[in-house]
């Protein structure tokens, strides 16, 4: 084989396998000497992982166990991955949490609410549903069935927000559906009153940018006038269809990656980091894997 062609072949083959591997991570070129990482830094890392992934600090017993495992593995990326994946997936009973998995998904549910509906509590949502249900009863007494049906739709949208907590955990919905529900209810509408504010807020909250003039005009026509427009490459003629087009777009997928970096690293990803995660996430909607790749990095761990 021609040496030049052979070199190209092995380069492309290596690139293919590295690109497709789930465990691919972005790290610094010069890895630190992990033998010099103090116990305190390792404890800080474990503490941060527990808070970010299940919303609490580790118990003393958990800290001792996790630090011991990480030290025994010389802080290997695989050991970090196992710790994080255990918090995401383990269903064993944990007093106070039900399980790590339940605590993790409840944490993601609360983070999602915090992102777009100002962290509205379940009790607040239930209270609003109760008020509407009382009105529905009055509507039925008065025979005002149009109002009854409209209020029923409002209740259903609130209920879908509450259902996210367990349906996301059970794999019945992906993160795109979670956020579609989070911006399609009375609380979000109250925060962002009228179509003008709703369009700008939905772009800002989910995409981390404001719409261009053309995007705004199209979205406004859909929401305000139920006029059919092309939104993110899809036809939409009402608010529900506009939301579905938005969360199905690559723009939204980039927004999810930005959101995860903000949550875990308190910064936005650079273009290389976004590109690294985007293709995989767009194909799989595997939010958990993107989180893992960020949280096993030396930057996140504080080992760099």
Model regions and ranges:
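Composition-driven recognition of low-complexity segments enriched
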Residues: 20-304
């Amino acid at each position: 084989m021609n040496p030049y062609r052979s070199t190209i072949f092995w380069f492309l083959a290596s690139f293919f396998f590295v690109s497709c591997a789930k465990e691919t991570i972005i790290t610094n070129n010069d890895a630190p000497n992990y033998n010099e990482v103090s116990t305190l830094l390792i404890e800080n890392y474990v503490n941060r992982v527990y808070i970010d992934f299940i919303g609490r600090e580790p118990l003393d017993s958990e800290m001792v166990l996790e630090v011991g495992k990480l030290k025994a593995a010389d802080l290997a990326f695989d050991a970090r991955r196992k710790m994080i994946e255990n918090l995401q997936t383990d269903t064993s009973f944990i007093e106070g949490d039900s399980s790590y998995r339940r605590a993790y998904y409840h944490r993601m549910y609360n983070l999602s609410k915090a992102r777009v509906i100002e962290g509205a509590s379940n009790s607040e949502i239930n209270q609003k549903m109760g008020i509407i249900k009382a009105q529905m009863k009055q509507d039925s007494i008065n025979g005002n069935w149009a109002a009854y049906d409209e209020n029923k739709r409002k209740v259903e949208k609130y209920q879908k927000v509450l259902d996210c907590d367990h349906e996301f955990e059970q794999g019945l919905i992906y993160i795109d559906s979670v956020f579609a529900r989070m911006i399609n209810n009375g609380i979000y509408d109250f925060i962002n009153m009228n179509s003008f504010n709703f369009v700008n807020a939905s772009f800002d909250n989910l995409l981390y940018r404001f719409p261009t003039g053309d995007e705004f005009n199209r979205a406004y026509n859909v929401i305000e006038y139920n006029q059919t427009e092309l939104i993110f490459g899809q036809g939409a003629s009402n608010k529900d269809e506009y939301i579905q087009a938005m969360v199905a777009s690559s723009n939204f997928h980039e927004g999810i990656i930005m959101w995860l970096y903000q949550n875990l690293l308190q910064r936005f990803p650079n273009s290389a980091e976004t590109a690294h995660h985007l293709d995989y996430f767009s194909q799989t909607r595997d939010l958990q894997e993107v989180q893992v790749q960020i949280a096993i990095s030396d930057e996140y761990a504080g080992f760099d």
